[in-house]
């Protein structure tokens, strides 16, 4: 179920303050965040945000095609390494 259009998109206040501070200084700096549920808004375009995936922070460069998506969509949490090999030969 999607968020109601009457409400604004969710962005963590701390993350929003960091973005606004960097926009006023016109500096580019990596922003570290744990807020995977935050929605990407147009003021974030051009910044690099390091998103936590449960183990480490993955730096993601925000471009205009990412607006409207959540930050967590770009930092996968699971690492699929393939199915286990069947060891039928060892049983014979």
Curated annotation (Swiss-Prot):
<dbReference type="GO" id="GO:0005763">
    <property type="term" value="C:mitochondrial small ribosomal subunit"/>
</dbReference>
<comment type="function">
    <text>Protein S19 forms a complex with S13 that binds strongly to the 16S ribosomal RNA.</text>
</comment>
<dbReference type="InterPro" id="IPR023575">
    <property type="entry name" value="Ribosomal_uS19_SF"/>
</dbReference>
<keyword id="KW-0687">Ribonucleoprotein</keyword>
<keyword id="KW-0689">Ribosomal protein</keyword>
<dbReference type="InterPro" id="IPR020934">
    <property type="entry name" value="Ribosomal_uS19_CS"/>
</dbReference>
<dbReference type="GO" id="GO:0009507">
    <property type="term" value="C:chloroplast"/>
</dbReference>
<dbReference type="Pfam" id="PF00203">
    <property type="entry name" value="Ribosomal_S19"/>
</dbReference>
<keyword id="KW-0694">RNA-binding</keyword>
<dbReference type="GO" id="GO:0003735">
    <property type="term" value="F:structural constituent of ribosome"/>
</dbReference>
<keyword id="KW-0150">Chloroplast</keyword>
<protein>
    <recommendedName>
        <fullName>Small ribosomal subunit protein uS19c</fullName>
    </recommendedName>
</protein>
<keyword id="KW-0699">rRNA-binding</keyword>
<dbReference type="GO" id="GO:0019843">
    <property type="term" value="F:rRNA binding"/>
</dbReference>
<dbReference type="GO" id="GO:0006412">
    <property type="term" value="P:translation"/>
</dbReference>
<dbReference type="GO" id="GO:0000028">
    <property type="term" value="P:ribosomal small subunit assembly"/>
</dbReference>
<comment type="similarity">
    <text>Belongs to the universal ribosomal protein uS19 family.</text>
</comment>
<keyword id="KW-0934">Plastid</keyword>
<dbReference type="InterPro" id="IPR005732">
    <property type="entry name" value="Ribosomal_uS19_bac-type"/>
</dbReference>
<dbReference type="InterPro" id="IPR002222">
    <property type="entry name" value="Ribosomal_uS19"/>
</dbReference>
């Amino acid at each position: 179920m999607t968020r109601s259009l009457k409400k604004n998109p969710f962005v963590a206040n701390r993350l929003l303050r960091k973005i606004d501070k960097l926009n006023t200084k016109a500096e580019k700096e990596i922003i570290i965040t744990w807020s995977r549920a935050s929605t990407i808004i147009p003021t974030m375009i051009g910044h690099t945000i390091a998103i936590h995936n449960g183990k480490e922070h993955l730096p993601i460069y925000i471009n205009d095609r990412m607006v409207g998506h959540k930050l967590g969509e770009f930092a996968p949490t699971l690492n699929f390494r393939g199915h286990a090999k069947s060891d039928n030969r060892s049983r014979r």
